[in-house]
């Protein structure tokens, strides 16, 4: 299982939100590239970046910071937040991002996902952010009326490389990963899923490991590695063993 340390960028700084709320922000570092180096030094194999300003604005807002991170580390990086057209996809892949995560676009513009997967196979993931099984869109601001499992099936047909599944009600709350819902998405789509939202302790990693057989192949850890609730080095070692 791959552990993805999360670096959420807002206003050029590394922050964490609680339940995706922009009015509930904690700043953890002024330089996200330093954070990236720290996690890479721990042995991280892959980084998860989110352009929070981009998610809200619908276009990339922290490109200089993202560029600095890509120059600082040699490990692959996946990025989400405000990627809503082919021009942005091409630009970010050229910049050196390995995997791009399409969010709201998957619901509002599925043709974009289809086209991106055809043009850049293996580089496109879809973020399914859900509350009570319903997909949320536009920086989690509103519900879509679409069931998360149905969206997973549709995305699998397009040839999406991975799904990043976030249970919004648990994100940044340190209440534990919604393991069952994550595994259900993997089974529904027959596609690899990365768990996100709510990692509170090393136990969450242990709870996810048995679901690798269902297709849960990764886990994003955010707030817990910043507060010290999870030791990233320990989590990485555990995931490697599993």
Q: For the regions a protein language model found, what residue spans apply to each?
A:
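Structural preference for beta-strand elements that scaffold enzyme active sites
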Residues: 2-6, 46, 74-78, 99-101, ...
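Charged helix-capping and loop-helix junction motifs
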Residues: 60-67, 110, 141-150, 175-184
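Conserved anion-binding
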Residues: 12-15, 19-23, 97-171
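Glycine-rich, proline-tolerant flexible connector loops at the mouths of alpha/beta enzymes
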Residues: 46-64, 104, 165-175
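C-terminal helical cap(s) of enzyme catalytic domains, especially alpha/beta-barrels
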Residues: 112-119, 209-219, 225-242
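Conserved, mostly hydrophobic/aromatic
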Residues: 8, 39, 47, 92, ...
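Catalytic cores of alpha/beta
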Residues: 73, 77-99, 180-215, 235
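Glycine/small-residue-rich loop that forms an oxyanion/phosphate-binding "nest" at active or ligand-binding sites
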Residues: 53, 61-118
């Amino acid at each position: 299982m791959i552990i993805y340390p999360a670096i959420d960028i807002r206003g050029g700084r590394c922050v964490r939100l609680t339940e995706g709320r922009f009015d509930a922000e904690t700043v953890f570092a002024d330089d996200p590239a330093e954070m990236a180096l720290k996690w890479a030094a721990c042995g991280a194999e892959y980084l998860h970046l989110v352009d929070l300003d981009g998610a809200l604005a619908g276009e990339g807002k922290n490109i200089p910071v993202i560029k600095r991170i890509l120059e600082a580390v040699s490990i692959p990086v996946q990025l989400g937040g405000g990627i809503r057209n082919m021009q942005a996809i091409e630009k970010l892949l050229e910049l050196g991002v390995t995997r791009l995560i399409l969010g709201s676009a998957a619901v509002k513009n599925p043709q974009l996902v289809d086209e991106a997967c055809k043009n850049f196979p293996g580089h496109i993931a879809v973020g399914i952010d859900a509350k009570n099984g319903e997909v949320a869109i536009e920086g989690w601001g509103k519900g879509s009326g679409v069931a998360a499992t149905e969206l997973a099936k549709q995305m699998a047909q397009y040839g999406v490389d991975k799904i990043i599944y976030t249970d919004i009600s648990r994100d940044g709350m340190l209440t534990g990963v919604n393991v069952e819902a994550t595994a259900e998405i993997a089974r529904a789509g027959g596609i690899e899923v990365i768990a996100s939202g709510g990692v509170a302790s090393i136990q969450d990693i242990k709870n996810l490991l048995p679901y690798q057989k269902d297709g849960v192949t990764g886990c994003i850890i955010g707030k817990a590695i910043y507060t010290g609730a999870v030791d990233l080095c320990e989590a990485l070692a555990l995931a490697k063993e599993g």
